[in-house]
Design a protein with these regions (language model features):
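N-terminal chloroplast transit peptides
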Residues: 1-43
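FAD-binding core/adjacent interface of flavoenzyme oxidoreductases
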Residues: 39, 50, 54-61, 65-94, ...
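C-terminal, flexible cofactor-proximal segment of oxidoreductases
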Residues: 55, 71-78, 83, 447-548
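FAD-site-proximal beta/loop scaffold in flavoenzymes
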Residues: 81, 227-253, 370-446
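Beta1-alpha1 glycine-rich phosphate/pyrophosphate-binding loop at the start
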Residues: 85-170, 225, 263-264, 273-304
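Short glycine-enriched, charge-decorated loop/helix-capping segments at active-site entrances
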Residues: 141-149, 226-230, 304-305, 393-395, ...
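A Rossmann-like FAD-binding core segment of flavoenzymes
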Residues: 164-196, 280-410, 416, 463-464
Length: 548
């Protein structure tokens, strides 16, 4: 079985063998059984200091875990601190896998683990932790602004997606990571991968950890950007932008109202998709201004996608400011007299608020400019969450690169941490040419397959597979009935226009997390398409009758 092919097909399960009793042993926690992997020798001491959960044992005096098997919480007792709730795994013997982050990497890893066949009693308990209660199909957030999709279609609840699986879900934010799989262990000790501290105070002890937390928008890049610009990376961001656009449209309703002005910073994929979608939505009621540091749009995109994007942006009369960077965003108030700008809200109504973007040339031959906007969207820059999750009072034990991403082996294991995997935007992994893999859904989707398989292999003492990214092409939406798709396996082929739009929706429908949700979304989209086609036919017939 080749390394490239294995994750894409259902793996052949190695011949089942009984798990040796010596691999299960009792630890100091009320006689609770934990998992022991032969490749990691156990220890509960660092030097002369006994350790529990990767911390000095004096901090904890744990009660026996609940035996009810309900996946609830039991509380450890501490002699000198307030008790912390300890997550109680339903089964005290099977391995415990904790997945942090419920995006493409985290959710699909959980579903991959659920789909594999496990010999004996080796099937792990899987716990998924995310700060939101919804999975978000981020490549289709733009369709929320155009009205093509409903929230439930691209942001289903985790509980709905996982209801037919054994995967448990907790809505919470990660506060601290304390891995212990890098420590030297003694044969007589117990073995655990470490613990995770959540913002609620809950402590999760695990045997295997998957870091799939993704990245956050870096919105504080220049003065005023954090206060006045909106990012577009989450469902909450998309709903906020939709709300702002709706309020602007309502307030400017009428022929004499000034045009709505939207400024978009950054013209990578996200910026271009936003510009095309919003410009099509506003039509003659507004203008879109797009700023980019480079002198072209989508600089990392294939030529076919880049040409299609530029064609649409120009056809929609989007104002492009290429070769500029934003140095500052500030708020002013513009009364009815356009020649008088004031900075005091008391001198002008709040409805007259305007935002000014100061642009500095990034290329020679350009002059500084000041743009006016009602709404500013920020699509450049991101930051990793891992750096702030490591203990501030201890040396960093998770290796990070200069961008705050986790350094991993080819097997997606964190370097020096054989029981910890990192995937998606959290991980720094290079392709065979030495270039960093792009931070997109396609990479995370493929890594989830490998991560799930490699956890299966590690638990069952099988060789782990090195991750190999297979670039299947790139897609982007360019409006309600327009998109561009470049397939990597057919050189020079780009599908755009309505054909590209239809192909993109079919591909994304097939990529939905579960079969049940896939069917629901497919039926919903088909019904909407039928209604749109009927409306278009009626308009065409009406126009023919009117012109005859």
């Amino acid at each position: 079985m080749s390394c490239r092919a294995a994750p894409w097909s259902r793996p052949s399960v190695p011949r089942a063998r009984s798990f040796p009793a010596s691999a299960r042993l009792r630890n100091p926690f009320g006689g609770m059984n934990v998992w022991k992997n032969p490749i990691l020798k156990s220890s509960w001491r660092i030097g002369d200091v006994p350790m529990i959960f990767g911390l000095p044992s004096g901090l904890f005096k744990c009660m026996a875990s609940s035996s009810s098997g309900d996946g609830g919480f039991s509380r450890p007792q501490s002699t000198d601190e307030a008790p912390m709730p300890l997550y109680s795994w339903p089964d005290k013997q099977r391995p415990r896998v904790c997945i942090l982050g419920g995006g493409f990497g985290g959710l699909y890893t959980a579903l991959r683990l659920e789909s594999l066949e496990w010999p004996g009693n080796n099937k792990p308990q899987v716990l998924l932790v995310d700060q939101s209660d919804r999975f978000v199909f981020k490549p289709m957030l733009y369709e929320l602004l155009s009205g093509e999709v409903d929230v439930w279609e691209i942001a289903p609840y985790f509980t709905e997606l996982l209801k037919k699986t054994s995967v448990q879900f907790i809505k919470d934010s990660v506060k601290l990571l304390r891995p212990s799989d890098h420590l030297r262990r003694e044969p007589a000790g117990s073995c655990t991968g470490g613990v995770v501290h959540l913002e609620s105070g809950t402590v999760i002890e695990y045997d295997w950890l998957v870091l799939a937390l993704g990245a956050e928008a870096k919105i504080d890049a220049v003065p005023g950007s954090a206060e006045y610009a909106l990012p577009f990376t989450t469902l909450e961001h998309a709903l906020k932008v939709e709300s702002e656009l709706t309020m602007l449209e309502r307030s400017r309703f009428g022929k004499s109202s000034p045009a709505i002005q939207v400024a978009i910073v950054g013209l990578g994929y996200s910026g271009v998709e936003l510009a095309a979608t919003i410009s099509e939505r506003l039509k003659n009621t507004g203008t879109v201004k797009a700023i980019n540091f480079q002198t072209t749009v989508c600089p990392s995109a294939p030529p076919g996608n880049r040409d299609a994007a530029l064609k649409v942006l120009e056809s929609q009369n989007i104002e492009l400011f290429l070769g500029y960077s934003v140095s500052c965003i500030r708020e002013v108030y513009a009364p009815d007299d356009p020649g008088s700008m004031v900075t005091d809200a008391e001198e002008a109504g709040s409805d007259d608020k305007k935002l000014l973007l100061e642009l500095q040339p990034a290329q020679r031959g350009l002059q500084s400019q000041v743009l006016e906007a009602d709404l500013v969207l920020w699509t450049v820059g991101s930051t990793s969450q891992i750096l702030r999750l490591q203990p501030p009072d201890a040396p960093y034990v998770i290796p990070l690169n200069g961008r705050g991403q986790v350094e991993t082996e080819e097997t997606l294991q964190v370097k020096g941490h054989p029981r910890t995997f990192a995937i998606g935007d959290s991980a720094a992994l290079r392709d065979t040419a030495g270039k960093f893999l792009p931070a997109n859904a396609q990479v995370a989707f493929q890594q989830a397959d490998f991560a799930g398989w490699n956890i299966w292999a590690a638990i069952n003492d099988r060789p782990l597979l090195p991750f190999r990214f297979q670039n299947l092409g790139e897609m982007m939406t360019l409006g309600r009935n327009d998109a561009a798709i470049t397939a990597s396996f057919i050189e020079g082929l780009t599908l755009d226009g309505p054909i590209g739009h239809a192909a993109r929706k079919v591909v994304y429908c097939l990529r939905m997390p579960t079969d049940e949700h896939r069917v629901k979304v497919g039926m919903s989209w088909f019904a909407k398409s039928a209604v749109d086609s009927l409306a278009a036919l009626q308009n065409a017939v009406s126009n023919m009758i009117a012109s005859s």
